[in-house]
A protein has these predicted regions:
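Sensory/regulatory domains in signal-transduction proteins
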Residues: 3-129
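Juxtadomain coupling helices with adjacent low-complexity linkers
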Residues: 105-108, 112-166
């Protein structure tokens, strides 16, 4: 099924989901369910990557997993697919959920409407990263991303957060 129709995230909505340590969905709120186009029971226990859009470079998720497995938060612009053939962009914050002994027990994601100007900058970057991954694997896209950030004299976090505030 082609993924062509774009759905916009409501300005005031927060799309919330929680997963276990393997990335299987344990909770999602109504705004998240509504945009994905399913009922709660349809997603519980399913891998969160069920909504991963094919336009997303793997390097972004590699960076995401490295960060959250080290108990560090990460912000990212993410293009997800709906389960009815559409897609939507979000500005997401993903963190590890910890127990009282500081062990990771799952992951928590809060996503909101991204800055439209930021998405126009992110789209060609992600397209380039995807192209590099097809030709040279994830290491090629990682190398490009690091060089891209270095040329801008910024870190990943600064770049992403500044785009959202842009």
């Amino acid at each position: 099924m082609p993924i062509e129709r774009e759905y916009g995230v409501d300005e005031n909505a927060f799309l919330v989901s929680k997963t276990d340590t393997k990335g299987r969905i344990t909770y999602c709120n109504e705004p998240f369910l509504n945009i994905v186009g399913v009922k709660q029971g349809d997603l519980l226990g399913k891998p969160h990557n069920i909504i991963r859009h094919t336009d997303m470079p793997r390097i972004i998720f590699k960076l995401l997993w490295e960060r959250i497995q080290n108990k560090e938060e990460i912000f990212a612009f993410i293009k997800n697919k709906t389960l009815n053939g559409g897609f939507y962009w979000v500005f997401g914050n993903i963190t590890a959920s910890l127990d009282q002994q500081d062990n990771i027990v799952g992951y928590y994601s809060v996503r909101r409407k991204p800055n439209a100007k930021a998405i126009e900058i992110i789209k060609p970057l992600y397209a380039k990263l995807l192209e590099l991954e097809r030709d040279g694997g994830i290491e090629a896209s990682k190398k490009y991303l690091l060089k891209f950030l270095e040329e801008k004299s910024t870190s990943y976090d600064e770049f992403i957060n500044n785009l959202q505030r842009f």
